[in-house]
């Protein structure tokens, strides 16, 4: 029959092996979230035209395309590098926060390299804080973005009834919905990283106690 110390050592070894597998899944989903974040930042499909809109078109954070008259041709403009071309202060703020969220999650992925040099639990906690901050920036970006719907360019596409937080004849598109889903994803990833980091810390403390007991018995 195994002694309590031997049983504890087997438990620790099994847990570390299982947590390693969970950590790999966490890393994969973090990379997936980064891709989602980049797509939301770049794609101009946050809001778009509807059946009754005066003009065809679609808007992103900083890039937008609007039709002209009865022509099906869309005129596109706006660039993050040309901040003055963004039609609304709210769109500029939303672009900044979503861009910051993207930068943080890319920084989190770069931090994976620290697993080879630093304490694993500490790296998990660093990544958890970065993911939590990334989620907070996404929340701010998604909340601020509708404040710019009263911009003249948006009204030209969506109609005069369009106002802050009211889209008039337009509708929300997939990139906006994806960004909202990304918030939940980032929060779950952050929570999981905190759990993994704290659990590894407690396991290390227990292992040190067992080793000290073994040394004392010897």
UniProtKB/Swiss-Prot annotation:
Q: Where are the transmembrane segments?
A: 22-42, 96-116, 126-146, 177-197
Q: Which cysteines share a disulfide bond?
A: none
Q: Which domain of life is it from?
A: Eukaryota
- State the protein's name: LHFPL tetraspan subfamily member 3 protein
State the annotated membrane topology for this chain. Multi-pass membrane protein
Q: Which family does it belong to?
A: Belongs to the LHFP family.
Q: Name one GO cellular component term.
A: plasma membrane
- Compartment annotation: Membrane
- List keywords of the entry alphabetically: Membrane, Transmembrane, Transmembrane helix
According to its UniProt entry, the protein's GO biological process terms are: sensory perception of sound
| Pfam family for this entry, one | L_HMGIC_fpl
